[in-house]
Amino acid sequence: MITLYFVRHGQTVWNESGRYQGSTEVALSALGKEQAKLTAHWFEGIFLNGIISSSLGRAMETAKEIAKLKSMNVEVVDALQELHFGDWEGKTFEEIEHCWPGMIEEMYHHPELLQLPHGESFADLQRRTVQAVKEIINRGDN
């Protein structure tokens, strides 16, 4: 049986300021760096065959903390990147609500219907990431 552990990156400087980041490169905050180290320690007694991350720096930095503890390398799979929020990236909740009234509520209540302005749909995100996970599982290297 294959067991997959999905880990979210540590807090970023945009998380701190309430900004949407998606596919934009945003650094981990001081707290996020500490969270990455604590997450790595959670894996101390767990055997891992591999560590896979998206290419976003915040995800890589978090994954590298686990890899360092396990003396392993991190494999990069671009398809695992976060949703591309398009025009929303870098904006706060308030800025988005001002520019696109009602869209945030729509995102939380009917994400399957939402197409982000100049961004990715949740259906596209799902297709991309599910395909990547299937490929990882099906390659047979445990």
Task: Enumerate the language-model features and the residues they cover.
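Active-site-adjacent alpha-helix immediately C-terminal to a catalytic or transition-state-stabilizing loop
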Residues: M1, V13, M60, K68-L69, ...
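Extreme N-terminal starter segment of soluble prokaryotic enzymes
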Residues: M1-Y5, G50
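Loop-to-helix element that buttresses phosphate recognition and phosphoryl-transfer chemistry
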Residues: Q11-E65, Q115-V130
